[in-house]
C-alpha cells in the first residue's frame, strides 16, 4: 500500500491557531492522560475461554451460527457449513492462512472436483473479482480481530482481499482463530493505534461485520439481508 499525500495541512493548522489567538504549536504536544477510562474495564480479567462464551451468547442474539472446531477438523467443519448454506459458488481471498490451516486441498482440489466453483481473489483480474463475488453463494475469510462483546469480526482489506468478499455473496463464513478474540472495540482500536505509532501502514478499508446484514424501519421491524449476506457463521478454531 502506497503512502498518501496530505495537502494544505500547514495552512489549515495555521488558520486554526490564528482563530484561537495564538501561534501554531510545533512541539511539546502530547496525548492527555485521561483520569477515567471505563472502556478498559468491560470484560476485564476474562480468560480466552470466558471471551468465547461471551461471543457464543452474542452470536445467538445477532442471528449468527456459531461453530467450534480444531485445526485438524476445520476442513470438515467448513465443508459442512458451506453445504448447510446451499453449496457454492464460493469466493475467498488469496490468504496464506488457508494453507496454514490445511484448507488448500479443499479449496483447490476437492471442491472443484465436485463441480463446486471456488474463486480466489486475484487483484490482476480487476472487475472479474467483483463479478465473482456477486455470483457467489458463500464468501469465506479469516477474522483478523474478533470482538466478543458485540460478536463482530474485524477484517483488514488489502489487494488480495477485496471488501466485496464480505458483502456481495448470499451467505458469509468467518474463520475465527481463538487467539484473535478480544473483549471489545477498545482492544481493536488499540491494535490499530499501535501499528500507527510504530510507523506501520494500516489498510485504507477496515470492515467491522456483526453477523448477517440487518435493517429495521422506524417501527423496528427487522429485515435481514438487505445490504449484505442473509446468513452468517463464525467457525472458531479453538487451538489457534
UniProtKB/Swiss-Prot annotation:
It comes from the Bacteria. It holds the Pfam family LUD_dom. Belongs to the LutC/YkgG family. Is involved in L-lactate degradation and allows cells to grow with lactate as the sole carbon source. GO terms for biological process: lactate metabolic process. Coiled coil: none annotated. It comes from Geobacillus kaustophilus (strain HTA426). SUPFAM superfamilies: NagB/RpiA/CoA transferase-like. This is Lactate utilization protein C.
Amino acid at each position: 500500500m502506497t503512502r498518501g499525500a496530505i495537502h494544505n495541512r500547514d495552512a489549515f493548522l495555521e488558520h486554526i491557531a490564528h482563530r484561537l489567538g495564538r501561534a501554531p504549536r510545533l512541539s511539546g504536544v502530547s496525548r492527555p492522560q485521561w483520569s477515567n477510562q471505563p472502556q478498559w474495564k468491560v470484560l476485564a480479567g476474562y480468560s480466552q475461554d470466558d471471551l468465547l462464551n461471551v461471543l457464543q451468547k452474542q452470536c445467538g442474539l445477532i442471528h449468527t451460527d456459531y461453530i467450534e472446531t480444531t485445526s485438524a477438523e476445520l476442513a470438515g467443519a467448513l465443508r459442512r457449513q458451506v453445504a448447510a448454506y446451499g453449496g457454492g459458488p464460493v469466493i475467498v481471498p488469496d490468504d496464506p492462512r488457508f494453507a496454514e490451516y490445511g484448507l488448500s486441498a479443499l479449496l483447490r482440489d476437492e471442491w472443484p472436483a465436485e463441480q463446486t466453483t471456488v474463486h480466489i481473489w486475484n487483484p490482476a483480474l480487476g472487475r472479474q473479482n467483483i463479478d465473482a463475488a456477486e455470483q457467489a453463494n458463500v464468501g469465506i475469510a479469516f477474522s483478523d480481530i474478533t470482538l466478543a462483546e458485540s460478536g463482530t469480526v474485524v477484517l483488514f482489506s488489502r489487494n488480495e482481499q477485496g471488501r466485496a468478499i464480505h458483502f456481495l455473496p448470499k451467505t458469509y463464513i468467518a474463520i475465527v482463530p481463538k487467539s484473535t478474540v478480544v473483549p471489545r472495540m477498545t482492544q481493536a482500536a488499540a491494535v490499530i493505534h499501535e501499528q500507527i505509532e510504530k510507523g506501520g501502514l494500516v489498510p485504507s478499508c477496515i470492515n467491522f461485520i456483526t453477523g448477517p446484514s440487518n435493517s429495521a424501519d422506524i417501527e423496528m421491524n427487522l429485515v435481514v439481508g438487505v445490504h449484505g449476506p442473509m446468513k452468517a457463521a463464525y467457525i472458531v478454531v479453538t487451538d489457534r
